[in-house]
C-alpha cells in the first residue's frame, strides 16, 4: 500500500510580475493575514532595488538571482546510530531549498532594526545578489557544517 500524499494548493502568480516565486515570498512576508501590506513592502523593495542596482537586470531578476544564490544545496540532519547522534550531510530537495532561502532572507531582514522593512529587504536582496549579507552567510555556514561532517555521509538514509 502506497503512502498517501496531500495535495498542495495551487499558487497564483503575483499581480504585477505574474511570478510564482514572488507570490510565495509575499505569502511568507505576510504577518497576521495582511497581504496588501506585504505586497506593498515587497514592491517598494523592488522599486528600491531598481533605483540602486546599476546593471541590465530588472529588479525581479535581481530578486530571483538573490534567492538562487542563497539556496542551500546540502545541509546536516541528525541521525541516531547506536546511542550516538551524528550530524549527517544530506542533499536538500528543491522545495526545501526555496523555503529555507526565503526564511533566511526574512529572518535576516527582521533582525535588523531602525529602518523601514522595504529598505531592509532591498538591502538584503542586493546583498544576496552580490553573494554577501546575513542570509548568504547562513547558507555558507550550512555548507561548511556539511563539509565538516563529510565523514558521516555513509549514514545517509
From Swiss-Prot:
InterPro entries: Ribosomal_uS7, Ribosomal_uS7_bac/org-type, Ribosomal_uS7_CS, Ribosomal_uS7_dom, Ribosomal_uS7_dom_sf. It holds the Pfam family Ribosomal_S7. Coiled coil: none annotated. GO terms for biological process: ribosomal small subunit assembly; translation. Keywords: Ribonucleoprotein, Ribosomal protein, RNA-binding, rRNA-binding, tRNA-binding. GO terms for cellular component: cytosolic small ribosomal subunit; ribosome. Gene3D superfamilies: Ribosomal protein S7 domain. HAMAP family: Ribosomal_uS7_B. One of the primary rRNA binding proteins, it binds directly to 16S rRNA where it nucleates assembly of the head domain of the 30S subunit. Is located at the subunit interface close to the decoding center, probably blocks exit of the E-site tRNA. NCBIfam families: rpsG_bact. Part of the 30S ribosomal subunit. Contacts proteins S9 and S11. This is Small ribosomal subunit protein uS7. It comes from Rhodopirellula baltica (strain DSM 10527 / NCIMB 13988 / SH1). The lineage of its organism: Bacteria, Pseudomonadati, Planctomycetota, Planctomycetia, Pirellulales. The gene is rpsG.
